[in-house]
Each structure stands twice: as structure tokens, then as C-alpha cells.
């Protein structure tokens, strides 16, 4: 399926940025829907084919009459109030996100798109194995699940093809400084020691560029109604990821493993089944963690004006 124009909410996050780059590199026009006043607007490229529209998620319903109706696919990656644990567990705020997702489906139809692809989270579900616990009683996870199921129903009613991608953990340029890997990078680049738990949690990290390709393949080849788990398919202890990150910056720097306690109810093994995504779309990651983290470090260095090992 060949697309000429796509629309993306959450375009300044790591997945959104990578998806923008993916389509622009292939000559596909992109409408990036960005929160007004976003400090991350500078992360977007400035090149032909990219149109930036400033609109908060609560106002998505106003865009149908303002944007062209020649779009082919809509990617809803935006989600408000995920900055910290307090907002992640605010029931009212996340109930609003469910409504925003349904407005995104309506906008998908108004823009002439044939397919809606939404970004979910591993927190929506329990693991695929008895010892693979990923579910937390958090408003964020509950709302993500509800948004995914209700948007599927609305797509069915509106005769739109629907796919939902449940992402475990991605990393790459554009990620928030507060995530574990970005905290690790930022601290090590200052020559300081980052503090962590023991880092024994088994984790799956996927480079944002690979994740973007997975979402593009969902839009092009995904099975209607499918909910795909999106990850690399490889589990490693978090402490290994931290060590590889440190080694890419300066192997002599210390890591403060075990200096922080685990949170209550901390899942120790996060995993899911990536085989349906591979079977339906042919997706497989192309970037090793070692390669992806080097690119991410370079991006942070450019932003901070520092050099590896400094």
C-alpha cells in the first residue's frame, strides 16, 4: 500500500520524530500535529513535505474543517500527562485521553484516511507467560487499554482499518531526560555516577527508528483489528543496558547499581509476543542496542554541547 500523505499526533516524541523522518525519506508528505508552545518543536526537521499544525489533543475535533482531506493514514501517538508518576496515576486526566483518542479516530475519517494506527503500552496487559507480569494498577495503563478497545469499536463503525501497537520501551533521539536511559546518558556525560536499582529487571528496548518502521508496516500491512506487541523480542537485565551505555561513553566511569530500592510492585520480567507483528508485517529490528545507544548519545551530545568521555 503506497501512501502520499500521513498525519501524526505526538510528532515530537521519539517515535513521532522517527516516523516523520521515515516518511519524509520516502517522499511521503507529513502533517505533524504538535502541542502549541511545545519546546520540542526544534526537534522536527525543516524540509519540504512536512507541515506542522499546532493543536492540543483536546482540540483535535477542530482540525477536520481546516486540513486537506487527501491523507491516507493517521498515527495517534500523542498522550497527555505522562511526565511523572503523579500525573500517570490521575484518573480524570487519563479519562480525557480516552476521549482524545476517539476524537483522533473521527479526525482520521474527516481527513480521508483509510487506516488508524494507535500507540499503546505494555502496561495495558498482563504478560504472555505466567511469570511475565507487566500489569500495574495505574490510571495510565487502564486508560490506554480503554482507548485502544474503544477506538477499535469506533473504527469499525466508521469503516476504518485499525491497528494498535503496544510498545514496551523505546529509546532514541527526542526521548525525555527523565527516562532511565536518558538519565544514564546525561549523568555519565557529566562524568558523574548515575544511581540505579540493582537493575535485575528483564527488559526489552527497541530503537525508535525500528519502532517507527514497525508502525509504518502496521499501517501498510497490518491485519485489521490487530493489537500488536511492539518490541525487539530480546530480553536483557537493565543493568546490562546501563553497562553498555556507560561503555559507549567512558568504560572507566562507575555505575551506582543497587543504590536505589525497587518500587513497590516492581515488575521484574517484562515481555510480550512479537511474533504476530513479524508474521503479519515482516517486521524485524535492524538496529542493535549497541548501535542505537551510540546514535542516541550523539544526539544528546549535540544538544548538551559535550563530547563522549569528557
Predicted features by range, described:
Residues 74-76, 99-139:
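Conserved Rossmann-fold NAD(P)-dependent oxidoreductase catalytic core, especially the SDR/UDP-sugar
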Residues 28-38:
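Conserved glycine-rich Rossmann-like NAD(P)H-binding loop of the short-chain dehydrogenase/reductase
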Residues 139, 145, 152-203, 208-212, ...:
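NAD(P)-dependent short-chain dehydrogenase/reductase
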Residues 98-104, 143-151:
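Conserved catalytic Lys-bearing alpha helix of Rossmann-like short-chain dehydrogenase/reductases
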Residues 9, 33, 74-80, 116-122, ...:
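SDR active-site strand-loop-helix element
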Residues 54-96:
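NAD(P)H-binding glycine-rich loop region in Rossmannoid oxidoreductase-like domains
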Residues 192, 196-310:
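C-terminal substrate-binding subdomain of Rossmann-fold SDR/epimerase-dehydratase oxidoreductases
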Residues 6-26:
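N-terminal Rossmann NAD(P)H-binding glycine-rich loop of SDR-like oxidoreductase domains
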Amino acid at each position: 500500500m503506497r501512501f502520499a500523505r500521513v498525519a501524526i499526533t505526538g510528532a515530537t516524541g521519539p517515535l513521532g520524530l522517527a516516523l516523520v523522518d521515515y516518511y519524509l525519506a520516502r517522499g511521503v508528505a507529513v502533517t505533524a500535529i504538535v502541542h502549541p508552545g511545545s519546546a520540542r518543536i526544534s526537534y522536527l526537521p525543516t524540509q519540504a513535505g512536512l507541515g506542522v499544525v499546532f493543536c492540543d489533543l483536546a482540540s483535535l475535533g477542530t482540525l477536520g474543517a481546516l486540513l486537506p482531506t487527501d491523507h491516507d493514514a493517521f498515527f495517534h501517538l500523542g498522550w497527555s500527562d505522562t511526565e511523572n508518576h503523579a500525573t500517570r496515576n490521575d484518573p480524570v486526566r487519563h479519562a480525557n485521553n480516552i476521549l482524545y483518542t476517539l476524537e483522533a479516530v473521527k479526525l482520521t475519517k474527516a481527513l480521508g484516511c483509510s487506516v488508524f494506527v494507535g500507540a499503546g503500552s505494555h502496561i495495558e496487559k498482563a504478560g504472555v507467560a505466567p511469570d511475565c507480569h507487566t500489569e500495574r494498577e495505574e490510571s495510565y495503563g487502564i486508560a490506554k487499554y480503554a482507548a485502544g478497545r474503544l477506538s477499535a469499536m469506533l473504527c469499525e463503525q466508521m469503516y476504518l482499518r485499525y491497528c494498535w501497537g503496544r510498545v514496551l520501551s523505546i529509546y532514541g533521539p527526542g526521548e525525555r531526560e527523565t527516562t532511565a536511559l536518558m538519565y544514564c546518558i546525561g549523568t555519565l556525560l557529566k562524568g558523574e555516577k548515575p544511581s540505579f536499582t540493582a537493575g535485575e529487571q528483564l527488559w526489552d528496548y527497541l530503537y525508535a527508528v525500528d519502532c517507527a518502521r514497525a508502525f509504518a508496516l502496521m499501517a501498510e500491512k497490518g491485519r485489521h483489528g490487530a493489537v500488536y506487541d511492539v518490541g525487539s523480542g530480546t530480553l536483557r537485565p537493565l543493568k546490562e543496558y546501563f553497562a553498555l551505555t556507560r561503555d559507549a561513553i567512558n568504560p572507566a566511569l562507575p555505575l551506582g547499581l543497587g543504590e536505589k530500592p525497587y518500587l513497590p510492585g516492581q515488575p521484574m520480567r517484562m515481555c510480550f509476543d512479537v511474533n504476530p507483528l513479524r508474521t503479519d508485517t515482516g517486521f524485524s529490528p535492524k538496529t542493535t542496542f549497541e548501535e542505537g545507544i551510540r546514535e542516541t548519545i550523539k544526539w544528546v551530545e549535540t544538544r548538551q554541547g559535550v563530547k563522549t568521555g569528557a
